[in-house]
Amino acid sequence: MRQNFTIAGPFGKLSGVINLCGEELGRRHVLVMAHGFRGSMDGAGRAAALADEIGENICSVVRFNFSWCTMLSNQVAELKAVLDFVRETMRPEKVFLLGRSFGGATCIVTACGGEDAYRPYGMVLWSAPNSLKQTFIQVLGEDIFQEALHGKTIVLDDERGHDEIPATFVTDLFHYDVAEFLKKWKKGPLLIIHGENDTTVTPDQAKENFEIAGGKKQLCYMAGDNHHLDLRFKEAGELVKSWLKKNI
């Protein structure tokens, strides 16, 4: 059952959807999903469908939209606001995080930042980076990345539309060493899913994330697939569902 919600975030209203689990026992646990750069909570409909499937009989799911193209510091603050809302209103026994791409970096920083209130029981990193610099040079291009470091606004025109992003988006990235944060993940289940042919966040970054993290960890490469897992999204979703069932 889907329920829309809106909360007061640190930089304005945050809107999202709760999939309240169809099984009463499943409502004791919540998966919070964080989308990627220039993405949305619906994920072209696929993330919404996965949330529906998980919410049927595994656990409740919360997904939401970050402020558009906001920098990592702001995304971390917004994810914390959503987690506060989840803990206060849903009172779950276990909270899980699932971060796609840049949302994965947001989850790592939030989960491993040393605040117990924001540390989940388990975490899924879906096409998530290990090096923000390497990743955003690939995403933006070397020239645009370097120009942003010198204060020039980032202008993107592509199939996703026209976006003008403040240069502080790039300079803010240098405040966060994702790898150093992830080294603090010492216990708890961790599932890493990554496309074998990902050219946006290279597959070696998933391997590095797997090697430096602790806990009960699992790395699954999606054979022949890209950053968005266009070929094997359904298979990746089944991995997430199976992993949740084992850890609830």
Residue ranges and their predicted role:
Residues 1-26:
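N-terminal cap/lid segment of alpha/beta-hydrolase-fold proteins
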Residues 4, 10, 14, 96, ...:
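The alpha/beta-hydrolase serine catalytic core
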Residues 13, 23-68:
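Short, surface-exposed "cap/lid" segments of acyl-processing enzymes
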Residues 33-37, 101, 195:
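Glycine-rich His-Gly loop
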Residues 44, 48, 73-76, 203-207:
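Short, surface-exposed alpha-helical segments at coil->helix boundaries
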Residues 54, 110-114:
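Aromatic pocket-lining residues of Rossmann-like dinucleotide-binding sites
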Residues 62-94:
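Catalytic nucleophile-loop/oxyanion-hole region of alpha/beta-hydrolase
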Residues 99-109:
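Glycine-rich nucleophile elbow surrounding the catalytic serine of serine-hydrolase chemistry
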